[in-house]
Amino acid sequence: MIRQRTLKSTVKATGVGLHGGRKVNLVLRPAAPDTGIVFHRVDLDPPLDLPADPYAVCDTRMCSGLEKGGQKVGTVEHLMSALAGLGIDNLHIDVDAPEIPILDGSSGPFVFLLQSAGIEEQKAPKRFLRVKKPVEYREGDKWVRLEPYDGFRLDFSIVFNHPAIDSTSTAVSIDFATHSYVRDVARARTFGFMQDVEFMRANGLALGGSLENAIVMDEYRVLNADGLRYADEFVKHKVLDAIGDLYLCGHPLLARYSAHKSGHALNNQILRVLLEDRSAWEIVSFEREAATPPAVAHQFAPVLAAA
């Protein structure tokens, strides 16, 4: 049986919010089967619960944020991506600020944090959202599509017309039947341009951004002294974001995701298009090994092998 997962123990981290620029304390706590991923704004009185939900996504300018009752938790996508990559279904996330800390701008520190807490398989079958027919969403020359697939594959292409990005691969395919989230995706950092910083900060964004938590470029080159972590780090970060954005549906997807110039807004829209067509998806579990697609068995191999 492919089982649900949570953490073995509670783990804590402290970092800076990318957009607010203030200190943020984060606590990740185990949760019972079928709880899902639930964010808790513990700085509010009373504390506010915000479950992962594509219909709660409110602000997609520079990140994915959840909103409830006028209160928000922003920049959830890197943590959500790490949870999806490690197959964690159930978790309580306590945060004392309106956003998740950015850490190093990738999912790598979240992966380390989660693995250090230990991952526990639970006595309940993992529930997948299987795409049954193609759905698509377009805005101008940007598009995103979900199609039936016995596993989880992402094909992504980007266009930025910038020499530092154009000199790298601008398209990538990641299939978790053969690729590893931890090895191939998790370390890709968010990126931005110096000329955008003044505008963003005037709008209350990226106040905590620095070379410590993003790839930063001027008009011609990457400014980070250590360069890139992957030859295709830019497009891989877009894949990392997409994995986190899609996991807000509450279940791992069995689907092929294809996108061109997509971002948080389009990723959220394609989930809404999918969920609103009840004939386009179903919830499935794999309680018998013989019925489990090989790609799923590989991606969600027992924890000892995955960790």
Curated annotation (Swiss-Prot):
Pathway: Glycolipid biosynthesis; lipid IV(A) biosynthesis; lipid IV(A) from (3R)-3-hydroxytetradecanoyl-[acyl-carrier-protein] and UDP-N-acetyl-alpha-D-glucosamine: step 2/6. Keywords: Hydrolase, Lipid A biosynthesis, Lipid biosynthesis, Lipid metabolism, Metal-binding, Zinc. It catalyses: a UDP-3-O-[(3R)-3-hydroxyacyl]-N-acetyl-alpha-D-glucosamine + H2O = a UDP-3-O-[(3R)-3-hydroxyacyl]-alpha-D-glucosamine + acetate. Zn(2+) binds at H78, H237, D241. GO terms for cellular component: membrane. Its cofactor is Zn(2+). It comes from the Bacteria. Belongs to the LpxC family. NCBIfam families: lpxC. This is UDP-3-O-acyl-N-acetylglucosamine deacetylase. It comes from Azoarcus sp. (strain BH72).
